């Protein structure tokens, strides 16, 4: 019996949704509500491949969900709201409390709220979505899917910072990692494509978009990842610095007269590719600029690729080798150039890749870019976090 599952990603003023038929993983419709709580909110829904857009004031997330459900009925996507069997909600931070997805109860809601200090920009917004759906669809399972959960299998030696140990015990200061739902999806898909049990594979997953993280996945479990206590750590990103020497923060404060909050804002929003190039956080713009001879744009691309390259070497060492390297997310799926730069010189590790295959894989295409004889396989997999969310609703919502 097929089930209709809603995969939800709620922001403070937005609500992204996908309605998925399970277990077929067939997309029924998707859409977005923008500018919730502001004038002229925008509601967009896909009907028969066409986007239908309406502009109206939407005061809060409850009203946004109401409008979405009405649109489902108006466009004959469902006959009745009881046709929806479950909802899955992306929650950015599950701390140490949630090592896997969980059916939402009042108690779980309270715990997600308590974890808001670890993700003050995201968890409160995710909760708004959860509360709206629980209010309007009270009789179906609602499941929380945490970005951090997949990385809860990391050993202490990977997640502890070399700080006074009581900081970890008292304040929860440790590496948590993010993009877990994506890393989990592509690692499972890589095993399927190779027709091998995931338990037998050492996978390095490169989720490279405007935000980027690398994960070492040994036997299907995350044993290390590049993001840390927050998504600011790790590799260079669109506007985020990635790892820097922590002593730079007081140094920059002293030199510029800025507060710690202002420096943090710069590290999050004015650094990375944007900071290095001085022109854009968008890799496509920088590639064009580099081609036309802009040295700084080229330098930004080189730094960006070099950091990812370094993590691949590091994680291969952590797992005593690697069987598969996966590229996913906006840049990982579409940038022929970045994949080439990242893979350059990895032959010593058994990575032999085919430039022609690399050039052919973009715009949502899936496939291998290694030569057949390459001991290490290299694969491009478009991520599908929504399908992963829907799978977890089936499992943890008791719908299987």
UniProtKB/Swiss-Prot annotation:
> Biological process (GO) annotations?
acetate metabolic process; acetyl-CoA biosynthetic process
Residues the record marks as site: Transition state stabilizer: 179, 240
* Compartments (UniProt record): Cytoplasm
The EC number(s) attached to this protein equal 2.7.2.1
Can you tell me which residues bind Mg(2+)? 9, 385
* UniProt keyword list: ATP-binding, Cytoplasm, Kinase, Magnesium, Metal-binding, Nucleotide-binding, Transferase
Q: Any keyword Lyase? A: no
Record-listed substrate binding positions: 90
Class of enzymatic activity (EC top level):
transferase
Q: How does it assemble?
A: Homodimer.
Encoding gene, per UniProt annotation: ackA
Q: What is this protein called?
A: Acetate kinase
Q: Which GO terms describe its molecular function?
A: acetate kinase activity; ATP binding; magnesium ion binding
**Which species is listed as the source?**
Staphylococcus aureus (strain NCTC 8325 / PS 47)
């Amino acid at each position: 019996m097929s089930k209709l599952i809603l995969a939800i990603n709620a922001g403070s003023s937005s609500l992204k949704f996908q309605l998925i038929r399970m277990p077929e993983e067939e997309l029924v419709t998707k859409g977005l509500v923008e500018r919730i709580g502001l004038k002229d909110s925008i509601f967009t829904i896909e009907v028969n491949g066409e986007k239908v857009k309406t502009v109206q004031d939407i005061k809060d997330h409850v009203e946004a969900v109401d409008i979405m459900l009405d649109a489902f009925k108006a466009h004959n996507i469902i006959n009745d709201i009881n046709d929806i069997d479950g909802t899955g909600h992306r929650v950015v931070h599950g701390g140490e409390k949630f090592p896997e997805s969980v059916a939402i109860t009042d108690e779980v809601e309270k715990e997600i709220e308590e974890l808001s200090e670890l993700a003050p920009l995201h968890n409160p917004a995710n909760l708004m979505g959860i509360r709206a759906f629980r209010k309007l669809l009270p009789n179906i399972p609602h499941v929380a899917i945490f970005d951090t959960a997949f990385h809860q299998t990391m050993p202490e030696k990977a997640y502890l910072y070399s700080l006074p140990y009581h900081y970890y015990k008292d304040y929860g200061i440790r590496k948590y990692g993010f993009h877990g739902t994506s890393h989990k999806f592509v690692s499972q898909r890589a095993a399927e494509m190779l027709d091998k049990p995931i338990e037998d594979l050492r996978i390095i997953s490169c989720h490279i978009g405007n935000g980027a993280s690398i994960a070492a996945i040994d036997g299907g479990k995350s044993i290390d990842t590049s993001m840390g206590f927050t998504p600011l750590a790790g590799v260079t990103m669109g506007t985020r610095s990635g790892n820097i020497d922590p002593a730079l923060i007081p140094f920059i404060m002293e030199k510029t007269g800025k507060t710690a909050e202002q420096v943090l804002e710069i590290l999050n929003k004015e650094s990375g590719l944007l900071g290095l190039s001085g022109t854009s956080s968008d890799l496509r713009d920088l590639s064009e600029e580099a081609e036309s001879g802009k040295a700084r744009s080229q330098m930004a691309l080189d730094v960006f690729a070099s950091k990812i390259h370094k993590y691949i070497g590091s994680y291969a060492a952590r797992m005593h080798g690697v069987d598969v390297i996966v590229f996913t997310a906006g840049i990982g799926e579409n940038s022929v150039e970045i994949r080439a730069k990242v893979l350059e010189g990895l032959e010593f590790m058994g990575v032999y890749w085919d430039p022609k295959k690399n050039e052919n894989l973009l715009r949502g295409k899936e496939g291998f870019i290694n030569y057949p004889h390459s001991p290490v396989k290299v694969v491009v997999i478009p991520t599908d976090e929504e399908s992963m969310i829907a799978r977890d609703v089936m499992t943890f919502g008791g719908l299987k």
